[in-house]
């Protein structure tokens, strides 16, 4: 089930609300990534404490480990990982795309060698829908081919991007058919592909909307923009984003997949995006790269060795409320697990608080002023 309400707009920025089978999600929102069913270093209770409303799970990896029998025994991913709020699962398409020479793509689906033990495996739109049904995720993503930015050492041609996009369109129809056959009570999202070519993005969106219309407007609960943040220059990413996002159906949520930096999130919301996911806040946290209102901090640098201040004096997270930069520097230097946990709490809190500030700014029709203040603060640098 998915109900989406567009509450207000400010320019292209949208303030909305999604009602899903496991709860309500206020948008725009950032979704922490839990690849193997867990957001790295975070318990479900800690995620709730910092304001997480929905998390992301990885269909491909959960299918391989722990496997579907384990999921069935727990009645899905919620029962397995103890998270009782909404979950979005990707389709597995991007992970298969990432295998490179280890996989073979045909019209039927993708044959590949398991990265765990080398077993020959096959994933198709139908199998992806069946896996996601057993995971019982609130938002199911269609199976797609993620059009690469580069093929070999050169950018993908328009013909190559077109062939990939049209395959994804055919797979979208098959995903929709299987989702319906499974009587899945959750929401299915479509994915707009087309590489760096605006005309192909338009063709992809038109094809997906035709599938949606054939189902009486109930074909897809939302629309995602895929195939960005895959190695392309930032200006190309922004060009495609700013072309596609305003053209997505206004009455359904818009999801920008796999993006990105705090600046990317603000630019995405300004273009009309409602949902984001990225491993950046958690991965960077483990590497000691921390986001603050006033720029980024590399906590391992010697300048922080004796610094008694918190990471960000304006931040209300557990880490900033209790620990100094010097302590976090020490934990990072000695490789203490607690350091990764405290860093992750802070980075995710920063991302989720940034989204909350944008929701408030849109509600008060002050988003342009928020953008200017955000850019000025981040440019100042963490002193």
Swiss-Prot record:
Specify which residues bind substrate according to the UniProt entry for this protein.
90-94, 144, 193, 227
- Intrachain S-S bonds: none
Cofactor binding: number and manner: Binds 1 zinc ion per subunit.
Which intervals of the chain are annotated as region RNA binding?
A: 258-264, 282-286
Task: List required co-factors.
Answer: Zn(2+)
Which residues make up the binding site for Zn(2+)?
315, 317, 320, 346
For this protein, what reaction is catalysed? 7-aminomethyl-7-carbaguanine + guanosine(34) in tRNA = 7-aminomethyl-7-carbaguanosine(34) in tRNA + guanine
> From what superkingdom does this record's organism come?
Bacteria
Q: Return the GO cellular component terms, semicolon-separated.
A: cytosol
Q: Does the keyword Transit peptide apply?
A: no
Arranged from A to Z, the UniProt key words for this protein are: Glycosyltransferase, Metal-binding, Queuosine biosynthesis, Transferase, tRNA processing, Zinc
Active site (catalytic residues): 90 (proton acceptor), 277 (nucleophile)
Q: Write down the EC number.
A: 2.4.2.29
What Gene3D superfamilies has UniProt attached to this entry?
Answer: Queuine tRNA-ribosyltransferase-like
The UniProt function text for this chain reads: Catalyzes the base-exchange of a guanine (G) residue with the queuine precursor 7-aminomethyl-7-deazaguanine (PreQ1) at position 34 (anticodon wobble position) in tRNAs with GU(N) anticodons (tRNA-Asp, -Asn, -His and -Tyr). Catalysis occurs through a double-displacement mechanism. The nucleophile active site attacks the C1' of nucleotide 34 to detach the guanine base from the RNA, forming a covalent enzyme-RNA intermediate. The proton acceptor active site deprotonates the incoming PreQ1, allowing a nucleophilic attack on the C1' of the ribose to form the product.
Note the subunit structure. Answer: Homodimer. Within each dimer, one monomer is responsible for RNA recognition and catalysis, while the other monomer binds to the replacement base PreQ1.
State the similarity comment: Belongs to the queuine tRNA-ribosyltransferase family.
Q: What is this protein called?
A: Queuine tRNA-ribosyltransferase
Q: Say which species the protein is native to.
A: Ralstonia pickettii (strain 12J)
Provide the gene name from the record. tgt
């Amino acid at each position: 089930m998915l109900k989406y309400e567009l509450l207000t707009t400010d320019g292209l920025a949208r303030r909305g609300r999604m009602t899903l089978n496991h709860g309500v999600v206020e948008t725009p929102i950032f979704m922490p990534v839990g690849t193997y069913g867990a957001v790295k270093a975070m318990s479900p209770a800690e995620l709730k404490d910092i304001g997480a409303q929905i998390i992301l799970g990885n269909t491909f990896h959960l299918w391989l480990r722990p496997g579907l029998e384990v999921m069935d025994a727990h009645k899905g991913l919620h029962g397995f990982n103890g998270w009782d709020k909404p979950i979005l699962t990707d389709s597995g398409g991007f992970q298969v795309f990432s295998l490179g020479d280890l996989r073979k793509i045909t019209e039927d689906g993708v044959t590949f060698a398991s990265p765990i033990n080398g077993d020959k495996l096959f994933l198709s739109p139908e199998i992806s829908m069946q896996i996601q049904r057993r995971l019982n995720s609130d938002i199911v993503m269609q199976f797609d081919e993620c059009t690469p930015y580069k093929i070999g050492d050169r950018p993908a041609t328009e013909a190559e991007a077109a062939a990939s996009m049209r395959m994804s369109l055919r797979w979208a129809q098959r995903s929709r058919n299987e989702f319906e056959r499974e009587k899945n009570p959750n929401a299915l999202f479509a994915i707009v592909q087309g590489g760096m070519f605006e005309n192909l993005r338009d063709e992809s969106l038109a094809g997906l909307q035709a599938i949606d219309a054939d189902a009486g407007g109930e074909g897809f609960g939302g629309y995602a923009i895929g195939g960005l943040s895959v190695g392309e220059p930032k200006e190309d990413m922004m060009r495609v984003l700013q072309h596609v996002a305003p053209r997505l159906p206004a009455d359904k949520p818009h999801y920008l997949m796999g993006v990105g930096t705090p600046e990317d999130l603000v630019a995405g919301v300004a273009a009309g995006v409602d949902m984001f996911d990225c491993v950046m806040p958690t991965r960077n946290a483990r590497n000691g790269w921390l986001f603050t209102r006033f720029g980024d901090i590399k906590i391992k640098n010697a300048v922080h060795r004796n610094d008694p201040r918190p990471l960000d004096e304006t931040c209300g997270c557990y880490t900033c409320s209790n620990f100094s930069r010097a302590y976090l520097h020490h934990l990072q230097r000695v490789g203490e697990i607690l350091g990764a946990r405290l860093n992750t709490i802070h980075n995710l809190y920063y991302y989720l608080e940034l989204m909350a500030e944008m929701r408030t700014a849109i509600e008060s029709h002050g988003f342009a002023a928020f953008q200017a203040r955000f850019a000025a603060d981040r440019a100042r640098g963490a002193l």
